[in-house]
A protein has these predicted regions:
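Hydrophobic/aromatic-enriched cytosolic interaction surfaces used to assemble or bind macromolecules
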Residues: 1-264
């Protein structure tokens, strides 16, 4: 049952706003600048090879005085309360959650509210070439950005209703369960169709014993390619909200995580 679409504004005050950014995925990267906005495969432009990166930057008229934002999508992250996190144990924490990749190192972000350490893996070769190419860099995992944005949204929408936020991506999706501005749960699940999405979504709903009227379900954006997902969930839950921004939605089917097109 659907009570009618609701559209709310997601504050964008803490978003990555620089025009220059690299979004790193397993098979390639999405590059955004004043002159270029496209997805490139590593087999065509390998960022871990210094000459290839330098030629690419030269072609796009980018020099080392720029400060690009490097956003990592190529490995999962783990959320640890800051008060429980010892940076010396980051590798051990993460190894209990996901397999550690060769030629990667374990790093972490601190969320803006300083409550969460986001632990993840970073490709050392790509870090090396980027560091040589720019004087200053800003590294961040995409889930850190999501958390910061959702906490900012929660500040202006501080009712006591539990909120389950959904970030749909090409082959996975993220769930953030938040109540009274506090993170209750975060997880990321694989998906290739609406059935996968529904399975994992309701598994989390059942795990936290959420009754139908006890929470709002909020999608970060309304993306055309996921319309059948929205239609399916509307048959089971009536508190559905789409977070829309003032800016027009950018459409680029090559970006594996469409929400991030709106904040680059």
């Amino acid at each position: 049952m659907e009570t009618g679409q609701q559209f709310l504004m997601l504050k964008n005050s803490i978003n990555i706003n620089s025009k220059l950014s690299f979004h790193l995925f397993n098979d390639g990267f999405f590059f955004n600048s004043n002159s270029e906005s496209n997805y490139f495969l590593f087999e065509d432009i390998n960022l871990s090879i210094e000459n290839e990166l330098l030629n690419f930057l030269k072609f796009n008229d980018i020099n080392n005085s720029n400060e690009p934002k490097i956003v990592f999508f190529d490995s999962p992250s783990m959320f640890i309360p800051s008060k429980l996190h010892d940076h010396k144990n980051s590798k051990q924490f993460l190894s209990n959650y996901t397999g550690l990749k060769s030629n990667h190192k374990v790093v972490f972000d601190i969320t803006d509210d300083e409550k969460i350490c986001v632990i993840y893996q970073l490709n050392k070769e790509i870090e090396k070439t980027l560091t040589k190419s720019f004087t200053k860099l800003n590294f961040k995992h995409y889930t850190t950005i999501l958390y910061n944005n959702l906490k900012e949204y929660s500040k202006s929408n501080s009712d006591s209703i539990m909120k389950l936020f959904v970030n749909l991506q090409k082959d996975k999706f993220d769930l953030f369960l938040i109540k009274n501005q506090n993170l209750i749960a975060y997880n990321s699940f694989p998906q290739s169709n609406a059935d996968d999405f529904m399975y994992y979504l309701f598994a989390l709903i059942e795990q936290y014993k959420l009754s139908e009227n006890s929470f709002d379900l909020l999608f970060l954006d309304r993306i055309e390619v996921f319309e059948n997902y929205y239609s399916t969930i509307k048959n089971f839950h009536d508190k559905i909200i789409f977070l829309e921004k003032e800016e027009a939605l950018k459409v680029n089917n090559d970006h594996p995580s469409p929400y991030f097109l709106n904040i680059i």
